[in-house]
Amino acid sequence: MKILEFDDKKGIMKLHIENEDDLWILHIILKKGDRVVAKTTRDVSMGRESRRIPMIIKLQVEYTEFQSFTSRLRIHGIILDAPERFGIKGSHHTINLDIGDEIVIEKDHWNKFEIEKIKRQEEKHLKMLIVLVDFDEYLIALPMKQGIRILAEKSLRTPNKEEENIIEDNAKEVANEVLSYAESLGIEVVLLAGPGPFKEIVSNFLKNIKLYVDSVSSATRSGLNEILKRDIIDQISRDYEISEETKIMEKIMENLAKNTGLVAYGKEEVKKSAEYGAVDKLLVIEDLLSSDEEERMEIEKIMEEVENKNGRVLIVPKDSPIYYEVRNLTGLIALLRFRIN
């Protein structure tokens, strides 16, 4: 996500959507009564026939729909402004927001939690290496905000009958270079891909790093372009975030089992802990942010209190492996820095 403009006084923010997670964040942040401006298409009567016309409209939000692992957010609402000649003001409409689109959001009041969530999403960048390997060549690339940086693009000794260990030696050479970059750049995860079995041999020498293995047609720049066109990088980023949520939940369950007093759950307990500045991590199921307006406002107030006192809020989607555990503990559960009772 990229913030293109933000006018705090007018409550207007313009955003560029870069990935699926951005759409999910907007699904959480957009509330009934907010206004959005975006490009859309609509069927308009033109004499005896109807045509789908592209246009820019301003919509007052009624509700939003988002399905995990899709690339579209549906924003339902009432048209506040549109080209006069079409006569559609006051009509119901749905804006389909996709990756690559821009949207202007206007709110009467931006909560600190909402602004921080968007800023964190803008800054979020998983440190990953893309490593493409084949028996005779390899390529190592670093995805960055400003584009892809090629770190290494090299040939390997061709396997032959006289030198039986060439394949294993080549695999060690690649693995050592990957590990060297991983250490110097603070890499968190490696995506290893290639056209044949050589990637599995290389993976045997990369045991101490988080590794994803995929197939690609070649270990060249065209293979790199092939990988970049897929959804796998977004999926890895999402998996990494889900892994973090899972670790927090494991710590919560450990503390509950030991009765340490370092866990709070339920609205009243968590609210009290937040007011004391005791909340380190807060897990909230997404249902609580799409329930009735009064409850949503209560939950958001707690979330904002946590953020204001340097705690971290993680929203747990329905497809998360810890969703049902969190839901069974009221859907709102906090790991505390210190006991308050």
From Swiss-Prot:
Keywords on record: Cytoplasm, Endonuclease, Hydrolase, Metal-binding, Nuclease
The UniProt record lists the keyword Oxidoreductase: no
Alphabetical list of SMART domains matching this protein: eRF1_1 (SM01194)
One GO cellular component, as annotated: cytoplasm
EC number: 3.1.-.-
Keyword Metal-binding annotated: yes
A molecular function (GO) term: metal ion binding
Membrane-spanning ranges: none
Role, per record: May function in recognizing stalled ribosomes, interact with stem-loop structures in stalled mRNA molecules, and effect endonucleolytic cleavage of the mRNA. May play a role in the release non-functional ribosomes and degradation of damaged mRNAs. Has endoribonuclease activity.
Subunit and partners: Monomer.
UniProt protein name: Protein pelota homolog
